Amino acid sequence: MPIIQIQIIEGRGREQIQNLISDVTEAVAKNLDVDAGLVRVLVNEIPSSHWGVGGKSKASLEKS
């Protein structure tokens, strides 16, 4: 059973996340030749204050 973990910065809507889960499930099932019902997708939303880019938090970069 494939387990896919995705980490994204928080702020996307439920529909966007549902579409992401659906599209990733379809791609994994097709490419690994497994039933879509066996694919697990975990989406972790990370606060921008906890997401670092170039030594600074994404939140601080957005304020600049």
Q: What does each model-found stretch correspond to?
A:
Residues 2-64:
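A domain-level signal for the structural core that forms small-molecule/cofactor-binding pockets
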